[in-house]
Amino acid sequence: MTTTDRAGLPEAGVAAVAAAPAPARRPRRELVAATVGSVVEAYDWTIYGILAPYFAEALFPGTSPTAKLIAAYLGFALGFLVRPLGSVLIGRLTDTRGRRYGLTLTVGLIAAGSLFLAVVPGYASIGLAAPLLVVGARLVQGLSVGAENPSVAAYVTETAPAGRRYFYSAVSYGGVVLGSALSFIVMNVLLGVFGESGVEDGAWRYGFVFGGLLGLTALWIRRGAAESAVFTAAAGKAAQGAALPAGAGAAEPEAAGPGGKAPEVKAPSPWPVLRAHLGRLAVVFAITSGATTAFYFVTVDFPSYAESAGAATKEETSAALLLGMVALLAAMLGGGKAADRLGALPVLRFGFAGLALGSVPLLLAMNAGRVPVAVVTVVLLFLLGLPLAVSNVFAGQLFPPAVRAVAVGLPTAAAISLFGGTFPMLAELLRSAGHNAWLPWWPALTAAVALAASWAVHEHPGHPGHPGHPGHPGREHPVSVTPHA
């Protein structure tokens, strides 16, 4: 008996895909190609934010340093707003021209944007053209970042070896942690070499030069990676009027070799398929909302929250975040390994349940002086690392290859824009109104919604991908959506 999603779509073909022989490939090279782009994406996004106080004076107009800094952060916010558009435009190219095409395009545009910011003339030289060019570069980078994560999700879903798909997901997403850490390292080097005045006088440009060179390195690596075998198979099937089912992963015919050109899929509009998968899109949106709200609360707003609550200074909380990042990365790698044995949903649900039920009590205990800020930071980031470890590939398996990048990207980018991009503003509004104590309830609530949404899907024990099935070939976990009574 086949299962169906809420739109009544049959969950067919999963067993055949799971049981097919794996192709001879070099999955570690493909993993590096996926991960290096995540490093570039995170570095680019973080370095702009931490360098903004240093370049705002040179590039933006305003009657005061504060006004110039706000204008610089406006460019940051606009980049968030165009992410959903990028997930559709570039994601569509990823679904029709190949995963490698999308991966090289996104990282190439990010690199170009960084190099452009490194050389853009100042406001004193070209007037209003300077901030307009900066905002234009951020819009291009926002479009690229909107498609980067779903393109990686599609690529890892389809290229990771049997039994290691979620671990590969964790490693590739771990590039975000490494990229963020790298941006702070570069910032400290610039301050150590040039001092604050030197960075303000133009040394900030070296941060973008490094980002551009990092992006070009990632572009070179990705151009040499193999195309997804699933995409290659989908292109051939599309030419014959067939299609691969949702859940199709690594077990497909031989991929296009490194540097080889993938066949283009002459696919129809993705919108009819997406409309038929509205339930799955909602699940991805909810899961991403829960993860991104917690991420921005702990990694961006937490120092201000703890200081306002009288629990710790910003310096103490920032130091605790370094230890928390280690816990985050450890949880992601451990969670990925656990998901390959147990399935993604137990790992994802454990993390969200901990955030939903434990965030508020833990933070109240911290505010009362009963729990150190370092312990709270480590626990929250460890819990967050579990859903982050598996969410990319988990979402990728919900959709057929023909629309996978767009289907993952659209709800993901929308959730990040709505819940991540707005969280710092929401936090400041609540604090200014004297309601700092309300803040922990927001990530707890979104985590609870994500946990509830996860029960709309399950790893069906009747599929060979479930570890309890006697025909289980390598601990793969195809996902089906069922109408729970």
Residue ranges and their predicted role:
Residues 52-85:
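Extracellular/periplasmic helix-loop-helix junction of adjacent transmembrane segments
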Residues 346-390:
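C-terminal transmembrane helical hairpin of 12-TM major facilitator-type secondary transporters
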Residues 218-225, 444-485:
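Multi-pass alpha-helical transporter architecture, strongest
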Residues 49, 277-327, 420-423:
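Extracytoplasmic gate region of multi-pass secondary transporters
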